[in-house]
Amino acid sequence: MSGYSSDRDRGRDRGFGAPRFGGSRAGPLSGKKFGNPGEKLVKKKWNLDELPKFEKNFYQEHPDLARRTAQEVETYRRSKEITVRGHNCPKPVLNFYEANFPANVMDVIARQNFTEPTAIQAQGWPVALSGLDMVGVAQTGSGKTLSYLLPAIVHINHQPFLERGDGPICLVLAPTRELAQQVQQVAAEYCRACRLKSTCIYGGAPKGPQIRDLERGVEICIATPGRLIDFLECGKTNLRRTTYLVLDEADRMLDMGFEPQIRKIVDQIRPDRQTLMWSATWPKEVRQLAEDFLKDYIHINIGALELSANHNILQIVDVCHDVEKDEKLIRLMEEIMSEKENKTIVFVETKRRCDELTRKMRRDGWPAMGIHGDKSQQERGWVLNEFKHGKAPILIATDVASRGLDVEDVKFVINYDYPNSSEDYIHRIGRTARSTKTGTAYTFFTPNNIKQVSDLISVLREANQAINPKLLQLVEDRGSGRSRGRGGMKDDRRDRYSAGKRGGFNTFRDRENYDRGYSSLLKRDFGAKTQNGVYSAANYTNGSFGSNFVSAGIQTSFRTGNPTGTYQNGYDSTQQYGSNVPNMHNGMNQQAYAYPATAAAPMIGYPMPTGYSQ
């Protein structure tokens, strides 16, 4: 549409440059490291009658969309698992051209070889272009970034030019610098095509270049709350012109304790703005934030309304003890690294554990690198770049990287430490199986995590995953008060030490319990050669086991005494079956790893560049 197009360089001849007062460009920035961030910001008292008017409804329904019947719309929404709440929600667009984006935006879309809008884009674009407030709840990797960036470009093109001293028109708040940088990378390509300017404001990087961008004028500012409040307090930018506000991963920002900063920032923005809130979950804290910041909003949910994981992810849970994790991790990595696609993220709970595990794996020759919040921005950026380009295919991370980390070809996620909530679990495993791809998530679950066992089982059942019988046993133990102390995991502790080893099943009692839980015909959670979300034996019924697993191929393989299939959930070990098990798999279709009689020579150490201590 011609009304959307704009070939004007909005930053041309505005005369923005360095201040001519001498001294530091940064000026007297707040040096307080502790205290109350934003305490210098005064809540503005807005008088809408005195504010300049602005337009925010630019949506014109495409003729093809107008001819689509309500029944066709409902059929499409059901097929894409789109749930809509709110009044007067526009119809979803089924093709890019139906959104009526400017020609230069469509050119970028064509270069990126997108075939059709994702579900959240199809329903989100008409809502955002209509100027309505909205909440979008969708799983990771669903295309949320373009869902708000492309309508933002249309919104900006219909606003007056920025003048000297004006702040951004579009503000995107993100929880982490990694996510902010990724949004900036996406925005930069479209902004170049539309002759707009964008910048990324985050902590851990020099303030000078960021201030320089703001002084020159930017239409789009992607920022983390802390650094933005710092700049607002010292007067390096303002939000007087902001009419399009995006809260990306709002649930994560609340988890990280940013709610006070978010509220102080929103107080600086005119109340008749358009606000879009995006989240992967919909807890009561996010609902309250939406009620406070949004007006008559449209709620769009993609997928199940309850807490759910991506169904393209094969989830494997190993119930074990903390002392067994290292051995299990190494055996798992030996199989994963023999795969052609082996990019893996290992999540741990603490920064100390991240550093210790990284040092240990690198000492043993594994190409691993670590990332957590105490790393400098330069080092974090370098580590992520090495991981993205496959130079270090093993990334050991805390939850700082669990949200918004968008690496397309991550095939495996390992939860070395189980997170504190099922929401974090879903976000962690969501680093694999981006878009329509498949992936595998392994989780070490210990008795210390028993408070999360019910939620984890619910997530597994919703995604039609096989459930480890030991998880069900933990639920029973918890109900009978035997989950901790003398009664908890009684058999596991006795079996672990009675055989003198700490790995797998080492006693006849363990095998007996194992047979009872799965039936004597099945010694594994999944059928023959299950690979990355392809459920070759899907005959589990309502989470029950034993005779309900009726795959004839599996039964035959075990009756013949030559078992094949998958090495899943820690219920099998080389010591148990010995040479009778030719194939040991971890949810992958590959040749068995041949465990040598003596320790193999370590791999060549992966060199760390100078300047980064381990």
From Swiss-Prot:
Pfam families, alphabetized: DEAD, Helicase_C, P68HR
Q: What is its EC number?
A: 3.6.4.13
Does the keyword field hold Nucleus?
yes
**Motif annotated as Q motif, chain positions:** 94-122
Task: Motif DEAD box — list its residue ranges.
Answer: 248-251
Q: Which residues carry this modification: Phosphoserine?
A: S24, S480, S520
Highest taxon in the source lineage: Eukaryota
Q: What class of enzyme is it?
A: hydrolase
The UniProt PTM text for this protein says: Sumoylated; sumoylation, promoted by PIAS1, promotes interaction with HDAC1 and transcriptional repression activity. Sumoylation also significantly increases stability, and reduces polyubiquitination. Polyubiquitinated, leading to proteasomal degradation.
Q: What is this protein called?
A: Probable ATP-dependent RNA helicase DDX5
Species annotation? Macaca fascicularis
Q: What is the lineage of its organism?
A: Eukaryota, Metazoa, Chordata, Craniata, Vertebrata
